[in-house]
Curated annotation (Swiss-Prot):
Function, as annotated: DNA ligase that catalyzes the formation of phosphodiester linkages between 5'-phosphoryl and 3'-hydroxyl groups in double-stranded DNA using NAD as a coenzyme and as the energy source for the reaction. It is essential for DNA replication and repair of damaged DNA.
Protein name: DNA ligase
Gene that produces this protein: ligA
InterPro entries per the UniProt record, alphabetical: BRCT_dom, BRCT_dom_sf, DisA/LigA_HHH, DNA_ligase, DNA_ligase_AS, DNA_ligase_CS, DNAligase_adenylation, DNAligase_N
A single MF term (Gene Ontology): metal ion binding
Gene Ontology biological process: DNA repair; DNA replication
Bilayer-spanning residue ranges: none
UniProt-annotated binding residues for NAD(+): D34, A35, E36, Y37, D38, S83, L84, E112, R135, E169, K285, K309
Catalytic activity: NAD(+) + (deoxyribonucleotide)n-3'-hydroxyl + 5'-phospho-(deoxyribonucleotide)m = (deoxyribonucleotide)n+m + AMP + beta-nicotinamide D-nucleotide
Length: 670
């Protein structure tokens, strides 16, 4: 066909394919078979290949994925994407309603399912999709336009030539998640923990073709500039978005009272497992925009909305065995082996049993029906036994008397609940020490994870951490899935680790009771490994937060010939043994806003790791703790901050975003 014919046919195909795509991906009512859709798509691809100038921004071929990007650009949100305060029970919801009515009188609410995905912003100009971005810190996100184009339920052109900015949740349906993990397992790749992580990881791929292959979906749940468009309520905004061609979740309800809201919440607590996607709660918003304006917002969240979070999901499965593992300090830990079961979006086959006393107290037996939940929706644990299901075939479990790895006798030290293997040459302990030494919190050797360490250990290439610094490229390329480039990268990472500051090495050595914070304090105080090795118990206890038990452990470690030999080897290989940080002085903390403050970190910081942030806080005289309480002074919230941020808001604790934190660091360094 000539160019004019091609132009007409391309326009026809775009109209057909966009309509068929809307019917399939948004309405879920396809009017043509998949084969016909594919045939028309191939015809359009062929025309656009022959006549590239005929390609338009709303062409369905743009969803296939363009060339890889070098990096994501930063995007400043015109209207901040605020997080929501949380409710965990009916009382919290009634308190929210009481606050709303005290301020604005009677109010209607809109209840929507809280999709467990990634919050995004999508911007249109004259009806055409021009930019999409992640939420980021609420003010600044990342430009993921090309990846969002691959989501077929997101319109590239609206039904009206309107300019707007909509907010939505990109997610991975359960079926897509299962299929993706099956494919990754077949290729020997690491599995995604849950659909939310899979969706977030897919949208942060620099290659849009990867995102296109992941079969993501998107529900739009809000309009940033609704009032500019003359829309007066949230429910009207959702209807308008739907009329423009957006996919809006039909499972929503306008409620006149808080009792109706609670009924909706309870309804979806029961119906949640039936959905083809994961939800983790219900979002409740005041419907009237006028009332929303009257209610206003705090620094982080609107006062006119709240997110009800479902309680941690509990499921019942069968305990088919108990496996005993040996950690790097010799502690022997029992782990439940379970019939695979879905819990909070992931398939669980293993769960912690803590120790022998826990098993005895719960009377947990092999063959029992056990109750599983995820602590914090992350770590699977056995919380109880369904005794009524016992049929007499269950077998009580007895902890072994000897190490499952080296056959050494296990002992229980005074005051401890764990059994321990005291053999310093135990293969399991050596392997776990290597994994710990290379970990991100310690020497941070990129590419040296558990699988590679196990291969190195099993091949006899390493027996202790000093052996890592003798590895050669020839040795590494002989390992499974280790090519020349990977070997070169790993050797470069090992070489780079030699320059780490003393606190990382000290933590990496795995001295009992010496965590990352204690390592930081010791390194800062003694400045060199030589001074630390020579320190007496009293000198160690003079360091803030170093108690008698830790001091005893440190002096015992440095008195062992094996430890002395290891440190001498590391020195020979050029591993740094000095503190590189800025030594704290009396003046330093006094000048800082963080001096003497108790600080909690939550969420992901774009500019530094969690440990680096912790180091900066401690350098400025602050103290980092892991949980929010009334004694917390400041919470520093990064991207995807969770329950800690919510609790801080409820307690009225000062909250910093990453920009505020960086400003304080910069001010102190001037």
């Amino acid at each position: 066909m000539d160019r004019q014919q091609a132009k007409r046919r391309a326009a026809e195909l775009r109209e057909l394919l966009n309509r068929y795509g809307y019917e399939y991906y948004v309405l879920d009512r396809p009017s043509v078979p998949d084969a016909e859709y594919d045939r028309l798509m191939q015809e359009l691809i062929a025309i656009e290949k022959q006549y590239p100038e005929l390609k338009t921004s709303d062409s369905p071929t743009q969803r296939i994925g363009g060339p890889p990007l070098e990096a994501f650009r930063k995007v400043t949100h015109r209207v901040p994407m605020m997080s929501l305060a949380n409710a965990f029970n009916e009382g919290d919801l009634r308190d929210f309603d009481r606050r709303v009515r005290q301020e604005v009188g009677e109010a209607a609410y809109v209840c929507e399912l809280k999709i467990d995905g990634l919050a995004v912003s999508v911007r249109y100009e004259d009806g055409y999709f021009v930019q999409g971005a992640t939420r980021g810190d609420g003010t600044t996100g990342e430009d993921i336009t090309e990846n969002l184009k691959t989501i077929r339920s997101l319109p590239l052109r609206l039904n009206e030539p309107v300019s707007l900015e909509a907010r939505g949740e990109a997610f991975m349906p359960k079926a897509s998640f299962l299929r993706l993990n099956e494919e990754r397992q077949a290729r020997g790749e690491e599995l995604f923990a849950n659909p939310r992580n899979a969706a977030a990881g897919s949208l942060r791929q620099l290659d849009p073709k990867v995102a296109a292959s992941r079969q993501l979906d998107l529900f739009v749940y809000g309009l940033a500039n609704a009032e500019e468009l003359g829309i007066e309520s949230h429910s009207a905004a959702l209807s308008y978005l739907q009329s423009l061609g957006f996919k809006v979740n039909p499972e929503r309800r306008r409620c006149a009272t808080i009792d109706e809201v609670i009924a909706f919440v309870n309804e979806w607590k029961e119906k949640r497992p039936q959905l083809p996607y994961e939800i983790d709660g219900i979002v409740i918003k005041v419907d009237s925009f006028a009332q929303q304006r009257q209610l206003g917002a705090t620094a982080k969240s609107p006062r006119w909305a709240i997110a009800y979070k479902f309680p941690a999901e509990e499921v019942v499965t069968t305990l088919i065995g108990i496996e005993v593992n040996v950690g790097r300090t010799g502690a022997v830990t029992p782990t439940a082996i379970l019939e695979p079961v879905r819990v909070a979006g992931t398939t669980v086959q293993r769960a912690t049993l803590h120790n022998e006393d826990f098993i005895r107290e719960k009377d947990i037996r092999i063959g029992d029906a056990v109750i599983i939940k995820k602590a914090g929706d992350i770590i699977p644990e056995v919380v109880g036994v369904v005794v009524d299901r016992r049929d007499g075939d269950e077998v009580p479990f007895t902890m072994p008397t000897h190490c499952p790895e080296c056959e050494s006798e296990l002992v229980r030290l005074d005051g401890e609940v764990a059994l321990r293997c005291l053999n310093p040459k135990c293969p399991a302990q050596l392997r776990e020490r290597l994994i710990h030494f290379a970990s991100r919190s310690a020497m941070n050797i990129e590419g040296l994870g558990e699988k590679v360490v196990t291969q190195l250990f099993n091949a006899g290439l390493v027996h202790d951490v000093a052996d890592l610094y003798q590895l050669t490229k020839e040795q590494l390329v002989g390992l499974e899935r280790m090519g020349e480039k990977s070997a070169a990268n790993l050797l470069a990472a090992i070489e780079a680790s030699k320059q780490n500051s003393l606190e990382r090495l000290l933590f990496g050595l795995g001295i009992r009771y010496v965590g990352a914070k204690a390592a930081q304090l010791l390194a800062e105080h003694f400045e060199t490994m030589e001074r630390l090795e020579a320190a007496t118990k009293d000198e160690l206890m003079a360091v803030p937060e170093i108690g008698e038990k830790m001091a005893d452990s440190i002096t015992t470690y440095f008195s062992q010939p094996e430890a002395v030999e290891l440190l001498n080897e590391l020195r020979t290989y050029g591993v740094n043994m000095a503190y590189k940080g800025r030594k704290r002085t009396a003046e330093t903390p006094a000048s800082s806003v963080l001096a003497g403050k108790t600080v909690v970190l939550t969420g992901k910081l774009a500019s530094m790791s969690r440990n680096e942030a912790k180091e900066q806080i401690e350098r400025l005289g602050g103290r980092v703790t892991g949980s929010v309480s009334r004694s917390t002074d400041i919470v520093i919230a990064g991207e995807d901050a969770g329950s800690k941020l919510d609790k801080a808001q409820q307690l009225g604790i000062e909250i910093w975003d990453e920009t505020r934190f960086l400003q304080e660091i910069s001010r102190e360094e001037q």
